């Protein structure tokens, strides 16, 4: 049975998969994002940035599997992602400080931005790569305008420092999101529609992933 390996330490991505009936093997990737972004050059468009980062993360995890977890690498699909928010001509990752998160929120309030999530997928069989692909999903996010006191309370929670763009849809930040256009799970960090398409192209079905990663319909009925 095919294992799904999530190459990310993101609690949001893990929850998306668990809620969708997948209990993945989690192996966090360790990629120097600044080096990858610098290599792309200043003219790289947002979709390329997140796509290349996701592909690099998936490749790093796949290399780890074929070197140290060959039983898993005998039949698995590696999924790694990278998310960034594009708004007002800027591409934003995780804020480095509370002050940076505050500045981001002041620029986002009452506006719309695009949440880009790159998805890197690698299929391993018999410890060899038989398929690899990387694509980007885009969701438009409409931000509300939190009051000064609400914004400070949100910043004090620390949540904004853990996520791209300094906000969440499924956490405390959801209070300040007026709506989304596109797939909501993409905003959390992993687009289920895009992932379904990518795994189908490498010869897998959702049912096969349920069967190989305890948590699907049959498991939940027990």
UniProtKB/Swiss-Prot annotation:
UniProt keyword annotation of Endoplasmic reticulum present: no
Its UniProt entry gives the catalysed reaction(s) as:
a ribonucleoside 5'-triphosphate + H2O = a ribonucleoside 5'-phosphate + diphosphate + H(+); a 2'-deoxyribonucleoside 5'-triphosphate + H2O = a 2'-deoxyribonucleoside 5'-phosphate + diphosphate + H(+)
Q: Where in the cell is it found?
A: Cytoplasm
Pfam families under this entry? Maf (PF02545)
Provide a Gene Ontology MF annotation, just one.
nucleoside triphosphate diphosphatase activity
| Physiological role | Nucleoside triphosphate pyrophosphatase. May have a dual role in cell division arrest and in preventing the incorporation of modified nucleotides into cellular nucleic acids.
Protein name in UniProt: Nucleoside triphosphate pyrophosphatase
Organism from which the protein derives = Mycobacterium bovis (strain ATCC BAA-935 / AF2122/97)
């Amino acid at each position: 049975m095919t294992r799904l390996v999530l190459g990310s330490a993101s609690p949001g991505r893990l929850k998306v998969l668990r809620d969708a009936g997948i209990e993945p093997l989690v192996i966090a990737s360790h990629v120097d994002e600044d080096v990858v972004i610098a290599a792309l050059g200043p003219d790289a468009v947002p979709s390329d940035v997140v796509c290349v980062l996701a592909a690099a993360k998936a490749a790093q995890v796949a290399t780890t599997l074929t070197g140290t977890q060959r039983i898993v690498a005998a039949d698995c699909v590696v999924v790694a992602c990278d998310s960034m928010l594009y708004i007002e001509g800027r591409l934003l990752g995780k804020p480095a400080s509370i002050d940076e998160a505050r500045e981001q929120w002041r620029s986002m309030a009452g506006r719309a931005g695009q949440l880009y999530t790159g998805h890197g997928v690698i299929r391993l069989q018999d410890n060899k790569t038989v398929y690899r692909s990387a694509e980007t999903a885009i969701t438009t996010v409409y931000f509300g305008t939190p009051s000064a006191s609400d914004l400070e309370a949100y910043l004090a929670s620390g949540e904004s420092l853990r996520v791209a763009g300094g906000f969440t849809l499924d956490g405390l930040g959801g209070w300040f999101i007026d709506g989304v256009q596109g797939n909501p799970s993409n905003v959390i960090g992993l687009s289920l529609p895009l992932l379904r398409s990518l795994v189908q192209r490498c010869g897998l079905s959702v049912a096969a992933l349920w069967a190989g990663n305890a948590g699907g319909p049959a498991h939940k009925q027990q």
